[in-house]
Amino acid sequence: MMRVSYHGHSVVKIETNGKVILIDPFLTGNPKTDLKAEDVKVDAIILSHGHGDHVGDTVALAKNNNAVVVAPFELATFLGWQGVNTHPMHIGGSHEFDFGKVKFTQAFHGSSYIDEENKTITYTGMPAGILFTAEEKTVYHAGDTALFSDMKLIGELNNIDVAFLPIGDNFTMGPEDAVLAAKWIEAKTVVPMHYNTFPVIEQDPYQFVEKLQNCTGKVLEAGESITL
């Protein structure tokens, strides 16, 4: 039995086969999360891209828990230089871990580490979506992305049980595009994410799920979960 929980912004926790996996663990400074970094126990971290609101507390969590960080190659290299145990991957590649199978898909966005103090931007590779499969169940975390037509292909090739889609607009697709994305990927359940963390991405998630067709839409508050 797999338990999938949402923890605000784009933070998703998966519990399966006695393992805990965190996706995009932006905890410190996240006004929408219920988690505190110092309390989190995790076996693996999966990152969609290098922006601060997704990498978040990765370095501290990985070191404190001796957790592996699965990330696009350049981002994994960047984090490895900081003493983190990483497993680099790239778009289209998949790997079987002891906690489940991870495959990276396309995402249309950016990926960089921004050092505000020194006013520098470090390239951290291509952004990715994440397909996670364990116990014959598949979770799709779209990462930060625009709508793109190959979402149809993702839906054709994968039997997706639950999909987390960004709806905040401005930096990612907004609700209207996310409704079309949900139609294309054909997930059984769709959960909105990446909204209401900052004023510029304020959205009504309940209006979004009401517009969904041919799938179940579910708004998860921070800490709520779905059992697959």
Curated annotation (Swiss-Prot):
Keyword Phosphoprotein recorded: no
Protein name according to UniProt: UPF0173 metal-dependent hydrolase BcerKBAB4_4442
Keywords: Hydrolase
Keyword Phosphoprotein: no
Native organism: Bacillus mycoides (strain KBAB4)
Record GO terms (molecular function): hydrolase activity
Protein family (similarity comment): Belongs to the UPF0173 family.
